[in-house]
Design a protein with these regions (language model features):
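C-terminal extensions
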Residues: 1-56, 60-206
Length: 206
């Protein structure tokens, strides 16, 4: 199992469904315009996985060539390339996690383990609270603070989130945040559902 998604294993159909459920930034909602038709055009070019799509958009020349071949506007493909970049979560510094033992963080730093990825990959028998937090930040959009709220709400792993129901998860996470004030953002069921769907991708494709 890998820390991040194996983009080679995610089909364009899977990614299309993820986009439909995601709470996209305002500047990226253009991706939902003619989504099904445009993804069908991409498939017609022999692109079947997210890795292949990312490679086809990896340079301005390749992007322009794909736009010419499909008739999809370059602006659309440029924004799609940016959104694809968000599939790979950047590791979180262990020191960013709230309410963790400073002594443990210092001890790990002495072993050159400073990020969520490094601690998660060490794995083994050390599947403690910190490991759970490192697992949770593998989910797209979940940072150190949200991971703490998820953990205290009873979701201690990617698998637990993948098996959650959005309404119930929102209720439990919101209750934790109301008590602890971990974050200021107002989250809704759609945000929880996106986390659940992304967690399912991690379970299936990491």
């Amino acid at each position: 199992m890998r820390y991040t998604l194996s983009l080679e294993r995610i089909t364009l159909s899977d990614y299309q469904q993820l986009l439909l459920k995601q709470n996209l930034l305002p500047g990226r909602r253009i991706l939902l315009e003619q989504l099904e038709a445009r993804f069908a055009m991409l498939c017609d070019q022999g692109l079947t996985t997210v890795a292949q799509l990312a490679a086809a958009l990896s340079s301005p020349n390749k992007l322009s060539s794909l736009a010419a071949a499909t008739g999809i506007p370059e602006e659309y493909l440029t924004i799609l390339r940016r959104e694809l970049g968000s599939l790979s979560q950047k590791p979180v510094p262990l020191s960013d996690f709230p309410a963790c033992s400073p002594a443990q963080i210092r001890s790990l730093a002495e072993e050159s383990i400073r990020t969520s990825k490094e601690y998660w990959e060490r794995g083994g028998a050390t599947q403690d609270e910190l490991f759970s937090l490192c697992d949770l930040v593998r989910i797209n959009g979940v940072g150190a603070v949200a991971a703490r709220a998820f953990y205290e709400a009873g979701y201690s792993s990617v698998a637990a989130v993948a098996n959650a129901a959005a309404a119930g998860m929102l209720k439990r996470v919101s209750a934790v945040n109301a008590e602890k004030s971990y974050y200021k953002a107002k989250l809704g069921e759609k945000d929880m559902q996106f986390c659940i769907d992304y967690a399912k991708l991690l379970v299936a494709y990491s």
